[in-house]
Structures are given as C-alpha cells and as structure tokens.
C-alpha cells in the first residue's frame, strides 16, 4: 500500500468539500434554502455548466490525493517508500507522464518541430527533423497518420458513447417512480418534461464522455496538444493545472469569507466607532497595490523557506506552501468588496421591525447577528462567492505571468502562458501551449460564470421568481 501524504492545500480542499456537503444536507432539510436551489436546478444552461464544473472538480480532487509509492522489497522487511510525491491523477495518467520528447513537437506530429542533431551510419552528424520517440512511433509510414487518427478517434468516441449509454440507462432506472414503465420515463427525458432538465444534463454528459474517450485513445499514441520546450505533453500539463486553478479559486474564498462576513455585519449592526474602524481598515487595505503586497509576501516566504529547509524537504512541499501562501494573501486583500456589500445590507436590516423587537426583548447582539441578520444576507455571500471564483482563476494566471504567482515548478495555466510568451516570439510560432491554457481556462471560467448567473437569479430577492 502507498503512503498517503497530506499537503496543506489537500487538507483545506477536502475540509471545504466537507463543508459543502454539510451545507447541502442542511439545505435539503430547510425549505427556504431548498427553494432557490430548486430554481437553479430548473435552469438548463446552469445544469449543463454544472456538469462541466463537476468534470473539473473531479480532476482537481484526484490530483489532491497525494502519496509516496512503496518500493519493491524482496526481503519483506524494512518497508521503504519513494521520495517522490505523486497524486492519484499521476497514476491514472502515467502513460502521458512518461512519454516525454526532446523538445517542441506540434499537435499530432510524428517529427520534431525543430531540427535536431542526428548521427548518420557513416559517422557524420546532420541537422534534421527527427522522428519522435513516442508521438506516432507506432506508424511504420508517417503518411498513414491521418487514417490512423480518424480510426482511433472513432474507436475512443464509441467507447465513450457506450459508457454514456450505461449512464443513461442507470438514470432511467433511478428516475422510475412506482410501476412506471421505462419507455414512459425515457419519453419524459427525451421531451424535456419534469423539473430537472435531464435531457440537457445527459446530452452534456454524453459530449463529455465522447470527448474524453476520443482524447484518451488518441493521447496514448500521439501528443494531442503537442509538447513544450522540454518535451512535456501539453495536454497533461493543462490537466494538471486544473488543481491549481481550483485551489486558488476556492481556498482564497475560504480565507476571505470570515473577514468579510464578520466585519461587514459588525460594521452595519453596531455602527458608530466600530463602523468607522472597520471602514478605515478596508479603505486602507484597498489603497495598497495587490501586486506589490503579494510580491513582498512571496519574497518573505522565500527567506523563511531558505532558513527552514529541513521543514520542507521536497520540491512539492515547498511549491505547495507557496500556493497556500498565495491563497492567504489573495484572501486577505479581496474581502473588502463583500464587506462593503454586507455592511450596507446590514444597515438596512437593522431598522427592520423584527430586529428592533429582538433588541427590545433583550436578545444578545451576537444572537441577533447570527440568527436574524446572517441568514438574510446569505444570498449576497453566495452570489459574491460564485462570481469571485472565476475572477480569482484569471487573477492567478495574471500573477504567474508577471512572475509573482505560484512556484515555477507547479503546473498552472499562468505558468504555461508565461512560458508561451517567448515561444510566440520565435519563428515559426509555437502556439499550442498558449492555446491549450486558454481553452482549459475558458472552459472553467465560462462554466463558473453560467452557473453563477443562475445562482444570482435564484438567491437575489429582487430577481427571485
């Protein structure tokens, strides 16, 4: 059995997952929370976006299960583990990890993108576009590439479609009520009847399964999105970057919420000098340039790691600490907007009759804020959280581009864009690294924004149907 390794970001991400599950169970037991989510469930576009988000979340969670593999021990004693820390996603994608080339190669290429030194049988050395070691290496004749790609794509798509068909059958069986015939259930799904848009959900899931099956079957024989300067598969780097984007978007929110909720409600409820102090605090914090503050924090972290190397023996642990520190700094600097919103809403709620009655009856201030004010501002919290998520994912890419983001050894879309900056200036242009980062980031941000729009419409009292 491998030895599990719990990085700080792993612990926090699973803590956040547990909090989400607990909130879901709590919401199912309370009608006033269940009703808005029921409205979200009726939105076809939101459910399609949720399917895409679940794919990203699944990849991120698999990449958050870290371990050290057990080394082979013939004697059966003194069990030892490898020094390298790998994730469950690394084990699943092991064929892609081990298939590194020498340097650049274009998508689906069989030859290198740049000329390399090759030694001839007579001892001479020449510069040529040599065959790749893994990409299309199974082809005896490179001219067979087009037909081979089409055949493997069709085979992978069929496998994905078969898995999707099993999923559809399972959904149909679970959707049956009483003695309903399966044909009747299938008819309701096909015509989009019922509160839950199962047709949209299943069609989106079908597209995902077919795409994953197609790409997986091709990726075992070709570099679908090419390779980078050091020969790493760009598709694999893009998939590994999902975890970084999700962590920056979620853990930053986890850090931001306590500051924003507590201080915002306190400022609006107590008013007076408490309101003045909190306003001066977030006004001063907003005046500090975020990039400069993050740069100073990252440099301070480098000094701390350099003086405490024994606490962080591996590159993965040092990179994880830098990622966690980046989330902390972003959380500390990004709570001011939500704090202002909650302060304004609390000022309005404080004048309501039920708040005045609770104060007159001698209810404690903490109890009033927890039981009467917080539930009435939760729609603002949820709306802000889902909208800020996509902005934080984009902000991480910007920070990595300017050199103050995550560690260079960490796979992230920002690091891919930063490395592609010089590649776009060369001739011929190496465009696939930038394109891959853009496509994966665009898919996550678009799905998050579409789902956020539905959540906003459902929880905003002014827009609630």
What do these predicted regions represent?
Residues 1-252, 256, 405, 409, ...:
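Gly/Trp-centered helix-boundary motif
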Residues 45, 170-173, 201-211, 227-465:
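Alpha-helical transmembrane segments of integral membrane proteins
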